[in-house]
């Protein structure tokens, strides 16, 4: 019995000590790992099979899209020492995201600033997050030094810190929006009338946009959603403009007071 326990213990140590071979940085991971990578980054080009200008997802076997439409270049590699995987979205603006290679998890949120369910995942700060937090740190340090140098009262110092904290809180929504300077081009310019082939996609999200309705004799019917009830012309219909960046889509309701909604161009889901 002791010998058996010793063998099991030794075998366990060997398993734990075994390192996964390093996967070189590549744009084409092994086929055996496609299911893993495409769970996290379904918009990467290696997740799609394109023929005659039409692409089909290799894993989900659905979501037919035009060739090179909403597909971005990604690079992946595995670090055997840290037992973590990492992928990069484009070489011009890499987005590093570490995850446990043996425990893939489904994700939520957009792909540039990915957030995963559960613990154990480490999300790297984006460039603008790092810059903002760096500026915040300098501002707090400056307030503290200023309070010491000018020998300000505690009450005045607390007011300064509260004011600065309010400004930081107001700046938080900026972190969830992409900066246009990080993108080199736009695939689809902002427009009020998307192509006919994309109506099903856009009207899944912006079902109240005016381009989603076919109006005759003052009565309108939704072009995509058959279960939507008929409405009076221009009733509950708002103007929407749409745009697509290299890796994401967004639509705006009312240009003057925009309601911005980001989405994954290659994987539309119902907007709630």
UniProtKB/Swiss-Prot annotation:
It is found in: Host membrane. It comes from the Viruses. It is a multi-pass membrane protein. The keyword Membrane applies. One of its GO terms (cellular component) is host cell membrane. The chain crosses the membrane at residues 1-17, 129-149, 156-176. It holds the Pfam family v110. Its main location: host cell. Keywords: Glycoprotein, Host membrane, Membrane, Transmembrane, Transmembrane helix. Glycans are attached at residues 68, 264. Plays a role in virus cell tropism, and may be required for efficient virus replication in macrophages. Belongs to the asfivirus MGF 110 family. This is Protein MGF 110-11L. It comes from African swine fever virus (isolate Warthog/Namibia/Wart80/1980) (ASFV). The lineage of its organism: Viruses, Varidnaviria, Bamfordvirae, Nucleocytoviricota, Pokkesviricetes.
